């Protein structure tokens, strides 16, 4: 009898006597790559936009940003996938991890913006006043006083954003496409766990 393959070999779909169907290592690697790239862009962008909205709520540009944030937050993920396909996949002439991360980033930003804005708004006004009284300008007070005080709420928003996009399938079907190989190239098609789940559902023999 053939030895039973270890969980590690089964996950990587390495041959052990007979080819082992399945394997999700390519999906795990792809998920980490795309999620990492999306987080690197979405977190600072979301925090900056949230801080801007919290401090300039009556500004016309801030009102436009707020409207755009609400619009993106309510947009179905499949529509974001189609838009990213037009904006990124078509100009790049191919599916890629970059396109997938752009779609995930677009979905993450509104959640981070709103969590940052709402957390900053509920901070005691005395924090900002004390910082300004000590001679700090608005930007310095925001960076050194308000944002550290709002860390808990902002971090919660980041976790919610990551939790939302990590299970998305529709936008990645239009952007990352999927790949059966463990791939680290960001300019090539790449797999993700939700895409693998969809593939396994459609073809149980995989």
Please give the residue ranges for each predicted region.
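Glycine/proline-centered hinge or cleavage motifs at structural transition points of membrane proteins
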Residues: 76, 134-135, 148
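Generic hydrophobic transmembrane alpha-helix motif, especially the helices
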Residues: 70-105
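Intracellular coupling helices
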Residues: 114-132, 140-147
